[in-house]
Amino acid sequence: MRLTYFGHSAFLLELARTRLLFDPYLRENPHGSVDPKSVPCDLVFCSHAHSDHVGDALELARLHHAKIVAPYELAEHFAAQGAETIDLMPGGGVTLPWGRIDMTPAIHGSALELGDGKTLSMGPPSGFVVRADGQSLYHAGDTALFGDMRLIGRHGIDVALLPIGDFYTMGPADAVEALHLLRPRLAIPMHFNSNPKIRVDPHRFAAEARRTGHPVRVMSPGETIEV
C-alpha cells in the first residue's frame, strides 16, 4: 500500500488495482492547497458531512469519474447532484473486485453547513476499514475514543489513521488509549494543527505511543510512504 498525506484528514491510498481518497479537503486545506485535478482516484471516501471532510468530493468525482463512498444520507445528497455513490451505514460493508470496505461507527456530528448559521443533519458520522492486497487500513474519521474500537481491531489492523487534535475529536491521550484497543501495526496521526483550536504536538503523541509499545509515523503534508 502506498499512502500520501495532504494534511488535516486527507489521504490517498494507492492499492494494486485502485486508488482511494479519504476526506478530500484539498483546495482549501490550511496545510497547503492541492488542485483536485492532480489527484486521480477511483473512490472518494467522506466520513461525514462537515466541510473539512467533504472538501472537493463532488469535483473529484466529476473530474476522475470516481464514486463517492459515504453514509447513506450524505451519499443521497451527492447522488442528487449527479455523483455515482456507494452508500453504507456503520456496521455495514461491501466487497468489491479489489477488496472490501467496512463502515465503522464514530462519535461526532455530521451536519451539512448551509450558511447563515443553518445546518442540515446528514445521518451518522463514520470511519472506514479497507482490506486489500493482504493488508488493512482504518481511517477513523472524526471521533471520540469509544470502547468498541476493540472490536474494530479484533481481526487485525495494519495501519490506523487517528485524529489527535482534541476540541472536536479525541486528543493525544485518548488517541494513545485508542491504540491500546486497536493494536495496529502502525499509527499515523491526523486532524491537528489545521486551525488554532486543534494545535497539538504530534511528536509528543508519537513519543507517548511508542513508550507504551505502539509504533507511530508522523507524516508531513505532501509526504508519501509505503506501508
Swiss-Prot record:
Transmembrane segments: none annotated. It comes from the Bacteria. Keywords: Hydrolase. GO terms for molecular function: hydrolase activity. SUPFAM superfamilies: Metallo-hydrolase/oxidoreductase (SSF56281). Belongs to the UPF0173 family. This is UPF0173 metal-dependent hydrolase Oter_4201. It comes from Opitutus terrae (strain DSM 11246 / JCM 15787 / PB90-1). The lineage of its organism: Bacteria, Pseudomonadati, Verrucomicrobiota, Opitutia, Opitutales.
